[in-house]
Amino acid sequence: MSKKHTTLNASIIDTRRPTVAGADRHPGWHALRKIAARITTPLLPDDYLHLANPLWSARELRGRILGVRRETEDSATLFIKPGWGFSFDYQPGQYIGIGLLVDGRWRWRSYSLTSSPAASGSARMVTVTVKAMPEGFLSTHLVAGVKPGTIVRLAAPQGNFVLPDPAPPLILFLTAGSGITPVMSMLRTLVRRNQITDVVHLHSAPTAADVMFGAELAALAADHPGYRLSVRETRAQGRLDLTRIGQQVPDWRERQTWACGPEGVLNQADKVWSSAGASDRLHLERFAVSKTAPAGAGGTVTFARSGKSVAADAATSLMDAGEGAGVQLPFGCRMGICQSCVVDLVEGHVRDLRTGQRHEPGTRVQTCVSAASGDCVLDI
């Protein structure tokens, strides 16, 4: 992939990058970046660092794709070597942001880490497993079009859907489709810690050929008596009915449960566990935010400090609108949880895509789950 260098007459706005979520956990690296920026002014530190190593950057996290391995017909695992400043002490179940330059534009999405946090002295590499979605431009490109050697931008690991250490004695994993990805990191970590003592895993996929990590899961079940795997092929057997989960897992109420998958599965799990008074033992991870029906006609979104404006309809998030116009916005989960994307609303009104709530000027809004409700101005 070709590398675009910043010219000497670039403005400060031209060189802005998304705020890296989790940067405050490792202030030392970011202090070094600031020092490098001062020493190399008026040139950018990256103008020098890139000559030594394309993974070195004073303003962002970077990584190199070492390889791509197909998991199923529509999914693949990316092996990524992170560069300077990446922290390998993430927790199993967390996700990272990945930015890829496609057709002259940086496209960002968040994906669950499927690797286990690196032990001291181990190879410094992480993996994410991506399922190509019909509406997902970047996911399709990552699965089918990205080549080894490609340099990507990274956002630090984050997320609260994590496995503690030590792990609880009784565990239940409920996964469906690509919802297995964060749990795969947990399983690999349990193996590394030698903590697979009593784990039940119920996984659903349309067919056996659609099961991500199918061979590895089968090997885990064969090698570890404490890991019991049940795979349901929904095309032939229908969807798992969690109201009858007691038939498969009689002690499910006593188990700490991690569930990840389509919205329907998670909503049913939430209801079943709540009805049983076991909500405190259920941990959910949602890959997409539930949105209300669009209201209004959208409007023109102006990004004040970037000096750019773009027309956006009522169903397009402020983040998507901004990135489409080339504005680099801070981001994290992209689904309204982590609060990394909040900016000040200077003028106009925006609407929360989840609740329909209208936000007034002078408030801070989440750009990933808010849309224009008429013309508006954001302080970024």
UniProtKB/Swiss-Prot annotation:
Its EC number is 1.-.-.-. Interacts with DesA3 to form a functional acyl-CoA desaturase complex. PROSITE patterns: 2FE2S_FER_2, FAD_FR. Pathway: Lipid metabolism; fatty acid metabolism. Binds 1 [2Fe-2S] cluster. The keyword Coiled coil does not apply. GO terms for cellular component: plasma membrane. PANTHER family: NADH OXIDOREDUCTASE HCR (PTHR47354:SF6). This is NADPH oxidoreductase. One of its GO terms (biological process) is fatty acid metabolic process. Its cofactor is [2Fe-2S] cluster; FAD. It is a peripheral membrane protein. Keywords: 2Fe-2S, Cell membrane, Electron transport, FAD, Flavoprotein, Iron, Iron-sulfur, Membrane, Metal-binding, NAD, Oxidoreductase, Transport. The lineage of its organism: Bacteria, Bacillati, Actinomycetota, Actinomycetes, Mycobacteriales. One of its GO terms (molecular function) is electron transfer activity. InterPro entries: 2Fe-2S_ferredoxin-like_sf, 2Fe-2S_ferredoxin-type, Beta-grasp_dom_sf, Cbr1-like_FAD-bd_dom, FAD-bd_FR_type, Flavoprot_Pyr_Nucl_cyt_Rdtase, FNR_nucleotide-bd, MRET. Is likely involved in the aerobic desaturation system responsible for the synthesis of oleic acid from stearoyl-CoA; oleic acid is a precursor of mycobacterial membrane phospholipids and triglycerides. Is the electron transfer partner for the stearoyl-CoA 9-desaturase DesA3. Catalyzes electron transfer reaction between NADPH and the diiron center of DesA3. Cannot use NADH.
